[in-house]
Amino acid sequence: MTSDDRIKLEPSWKNALRDEFEQPYMAQLREFLRQEHAAGKEIYPPGPLIFNALNSTPLDNVKVVILGQDPYHGPNQAHGLCFSVQPGVPTPPSLVNIYKELKRDLNIDIPNHGCLQSWADQGVLLLNTTLTVERANAASHAGKGWQHFTDRIIQVVSEHQPHLVFLLWGAHAQSKQKLVDATKHLVLTSVHPSPLSAYKGFLGNGHFGRANKYLEQNGIAPIDWRLPAL
């Protein structure tokens, strides 16, 4: 993240977000991350995966947006897709509840892993609103500038093409609802899938089936929410 020319970013996103890399907040964010690395702090996800959500789901391919907060802060977990973990890592509790709702809603078998890469490849933008975190220090990079960048991503997606689905789970994700044009898109909200709240309305929300129904009604191929075995 030292200069726009060196950022490995999928071309459609690089073009859409070009002006953001010239903003003062981005220079401050780069300097913050440089200082964190210089201090020997371990930052997740690894550098090449910071923009994995964008690189996995080009702008023209986006059908569904799921918002998370910040990356998992344990070793080998985060790989740049919200709620998702790298293969071989135990499925985190919130994702376990997402799988439970998929089973209830669409009778999809619960997979043996927590990697959601196949969703991203189909057009599900799995976007954390903060894209980095210090090891074992949740929310340590919140308020450092990423929020401006990811707010702009949400706006760009909302403006780019109609008939997308935004799944906003929990108060933090729902605080971004103002960035979405609800006259052009389907916005579905519920409590967060965390074990602390999932039984207060996440389980039973039917969001996955409702998302696919909306896409199909608008001539868009639905998401295959099944995850291949790894």
Curated annotation (Swiss-Prot):
It catalyses: Hydrolyzes single-stranded DNA or mismatched double-stranded DNA and polynucleotides, releasing free uracil. Its main location: cytoplasm. Belongs to the uracil-DNA glycosylase (UDG) superfamily. UNG family. HAMAP family: UDG. It comes from the Bacteria. The active site is at D70. It holds the Pfam family UDG. The keyword Endoplasmic reticulum does not apply. Keywords: Cytoplasm, DNA damage, DNA repair, Hydrolase. It comes from Pseudomonas syringae pv. syringae (strain B728a). One of its GO terms (molecular function) is uracil DNA N-glycosylase activity. GO terms for cellular component: cytoplasm. This is Uracil-DNA glycosylase. InterPro entries: UDG_fam1, Ura-DNA_Glyclase_AS, Uracil-DNA_glycosylase-like, Uracil-DNA_glycosylase-like_sf. Its EC number is 3.2.2.27. CDD domains: UDG-F1-like (cd10027). Excises uracil residues from the DNA which can arise as a result of misincorporation of dUMP residues by DNA polymerase or due to deamination of cytosine. Signal peptide: none annotated. It is found in: Cytoplasm. GO terms for biological process: base-excision repair, AP site formation via deaminated base removal.
